[in-house]
């Protein structure tokens, strides 16, 4: 349920302690990506892409914490032997269980529309030197989000901007990569009740990773990724006297084996760890997650 560890805050001479504690559950995580290119002229094409993902805790009767995300793109792409560039307008919808709605009673049966958004993304991929398999990738994205609930919309409706730059190089059966990402959120309402809207933020982060094909182990594939980021909010945080500052760290490990594939489906073993340190006690997080999955390319 993405709740912070138990904490207490001193406010107006009184002590207030959290009542919502972390809850564990077994769930089903799913993801489906589709893409189709329709050639136009020479290197130009119309590109259609969809992404669908989410988590369901239905079988543990914890669907109040379900989430789902869908995005559909339709735009233009140009691709040649060294470079790919695309401009893709998109529309997205986010669904959530009742735990994300302040105005709803607890419901463990279904997720409901929570947030809608529309925007445009630009992606550029460039093969620096095909001979040594070095690739440079750059993306730029901007979208506007609209929340369903009035009170949440007051704080969180607005524009998201992000840019990402990465460099990857392959050394035989080894691939190393690293990247930098910048995000910001600019709320539509800069001030609320004569106070700076503290939902606005800037985030700087970078990641490093290692992909390995272990031929000596008969086809084992591994992927290790670590990321580090600092998020700085504007305005004064709730129950505080200064802006909120977060330090975010994460680590993920993914394993698969070619010989375990069955009819195109490859099982995967995944582990992820995320940790957030913050001067706001309610923003602290420490999450471990194990999952068994199956990847199917068709």
Model-found features: residue ranges?
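Transmembrane beta-strands of outer-membrane beta-barrel proteins
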Residues: 1, 46-50, 83-89, 133-138, ...
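Outer-membrane beta-barrel initiation region
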Residues: 1-51, 55-56, 60-62, 71
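Transmembrane beta-strands of outer-membrane beta-barrel pores
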Residues: 2, 36, 52-60, 78-80, ...
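Outer-membrane beta-barrel transmembrane domain signature
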Residues: 7, 189-191, 195-207, 211-260, ...
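Residues on the lipid-exposed face of transmembrane beta-strands in outer-membrane beta-barrel proteins
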Residues: 30-39, 72-78, 120-126, 163-169, ...
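Outer-membrane beta-barrel channels and translocator barrels
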Residues: 37-44, 79-83, 125-131, 170-174, ...
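Outer-membrane beta-barrel "beta-signal"
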Residues: 270, 285-298
């Amino acid at each position: 349920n993405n709740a912070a560890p138990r904490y207490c805050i001193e406010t107006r001479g009184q002590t207030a302690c959290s009542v919502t504690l972390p809850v564990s559950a077994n769930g089903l995580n799913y993801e489906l990506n589709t893409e189709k290119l329709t050639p136009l002229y020479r290197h130009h094409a119309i590109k259609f892409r969809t992404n669908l993902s989410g988590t369901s805790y239905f079988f543990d009767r914890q669907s109040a914490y379900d989430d789902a995300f869908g995005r559909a793109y339709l735009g233009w792409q140009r691709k040649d032997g060294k470079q790919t560039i695309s401009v893709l307008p998109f529309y997205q919808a986010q669904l959530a269980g009742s735990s994300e709605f302040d105005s709803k009673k607890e419901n463990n049966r279904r997720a409901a529309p929570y947030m809608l958004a529309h925007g445009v993304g630009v992606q550029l991929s460039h093969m620096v030197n095909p001979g040594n398999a070095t690739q440079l990738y750059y993306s730029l994205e901007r979208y506007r989000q609209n929340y369903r609930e009035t009170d949440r919309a007051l704080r969180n409706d607005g524009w998201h901007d992000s840019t990402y730059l990465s460099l990857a190089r392959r050394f035989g059966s080894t691939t190393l990569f690293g990247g930098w990402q910048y995000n910001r959120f600019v709320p539509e309402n800069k001030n609320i009740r004569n106070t700076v809207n503290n939902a606005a933020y800037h985030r700087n982060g970078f990641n490093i990773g290692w992909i390995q094909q272990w031929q000596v182990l008969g086809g084992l594939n591994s992927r290790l990724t670590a990321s580090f980021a600092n998020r700085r909010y504007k305005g004064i945080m709730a129950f505080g006297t200064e802006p909120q500052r977060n330090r975010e760290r994460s680590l993920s490990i993914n394993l698969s084996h070619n010989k375990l594939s069955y009819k195109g489906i490859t099982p995967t073993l995944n582990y992820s760890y995320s940790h957030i340190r913050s001067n706001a006690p309610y923003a602290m997080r420490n999450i471990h997650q194990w999952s068994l999955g199956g990847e199917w390319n068709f």
